[in-house]
Curated annotation (Swiss-Prot):
Coiled coil spans: none
Signal peptide: 1-31
Enzyme class: hydrolase
Active site: E206 (proton donor)
Reactions this protein catalyses: Hydrolysis of terminal, non-reducing beta-D-glucosyl residues with release of beta-D-glucose
Name of this protein: Putative beta-glucosidase 9
Gene3D superfamilies, A to Z: Glycosidases
Positions of glycan attachment: N125
């Protein structure tokens, strides 16, 4: 009882101190001791922007010659895996309301807009063999031109988790090396059509997130995982497929960057999400392996000096 009372008293004192600190901070703000945050609070040249992804906001899923992506199929077939059981058929309707969206960005004082291009809106069948969709190119030209008119820079992501369904049906998308050249062909169309106005390109958005959630847990399209995973998938191999997909993403990135540097060089980026792994005595080796896989597998390719062959070496 004495110990419990001491713990309760200690917790009460800590709570009181926290409340006092919050009141002190609020008083400082009211007294004007902390300057308000403004553009002057940031270094010269700092870019303020907003971002989106094509499937999450465009809508117009069956308009303008667009072909389906794996997310169309996933949301239609597995609405139970979507929190509100919605899909991207309409979404934010940016396909029709992009001028209003750009106007709001300008009103908010944004310097840049990072958006993704829908691969299947440019190549409805995923590859050059299926033909180029001029209506899709016109849509993105109109969006980019509207951004320029309002003084907003375009930061373009080429892939944000939305593999064309045609390529998923043809050879299982990023599980096949065939995706490398098809992705490069798609990227080159974008460089040719939009590169005179777009100076910032992002090859892949968070590649590890795509690989792990699409092929390990099955919670993202195309929803592949081993039977015992929480995604309750009908097909997949959580121990192999995420690494196969990541491998092909890295090769596609490398081929596209080589092409870009040789023919269209301005600047290129990749958006990565690194992970912090908690270490503990019981699972120290597992934590180390998880850290290497989630961070080194992809970071080492994009940043030099990287970890070299540590991922491959660790398998021993």
């Amino acid at each position: 009882m004495a110990v419990a009372g001491a713990v309760a008293m200690s917790g009460g004192i800590l709570l009181l101190l926290l409340l006092l600190l919050l009141l002190l901070a609020a008083a400082c703000v009211e007294a004007g001791e902390l300057p308000p945050i403004s553009r002057r609070s940031f270094p010269k040249g700092f870019i303020f922007g907003t971002s989106s992804a094509s499937y999450q906001c465009e809508g117009g899923a069956a308009e303008g010659g667009r072909g389906p992506s794996i997310w169309d199929t996933f949301t239609y077939q597995h609405p139970d895996k979507i929190a509100d059981k919605s899909n991207g058929d309409v979404a934010d309707n940016t396909y029709h309301l992009y001028k209003e969206d750009v106007h709001m960005m300008k009103e908010m004082g944004m310097d840049a807009y990072r958006f993704s291009i829908s691969w299947s809106r440019i190549l409805p069948n995923g590859s050059l063999n299926g033909g180029v969709n001029i209506e899709g190119i016109n849509y993105y030209n109109n969006l980019i031109n509207e951004l320029l008119l309002k003084g907003v820079q375009s930061f373009v992501t080429l892939f944000h988790y939305d593999t064309p369904q045609a390529l998923e049906d043809k050879y299982n998308g990023f599980l096949s090396p065939n995706i490398i050249n098809d992705y490069k062909d798609y990227a080159e169309i974008c460089f040719k059509e939009f590169g005179d106005r777009v100076k910032h390109w992002i090859t892949f958005n968070e590649p590890w997130i795509f690989c792990s959630k699409a092929y390990a847990s099955g919670t993202y399209a195309p929803g592949r995982c081993s039977p015992w995973e929480m995604g309750k998938c009908s097909v997949g191999d959580s121990g192999r497929e995420p690494y196969t997909a990541c491998h092909h993403q890295l090769l596609a990135h490398a081929e596209t960057v080589r092409l870009y540097r040789e023919k269209y060089q301005f600047t290129e980026e990749v958006v990565r999400q690194s992970q912090f792994i908690h270490d503990n005595d019981l699972h120290r080796r597992s934590a180390k392996l998880s850290f290497i896989i989630q961070n080194y597998l992809l970071l080492g390719i994009h940043f030099q000096p990287g970890p070299g062959g540590r991922v491959c070496q660790y398998r021993h």
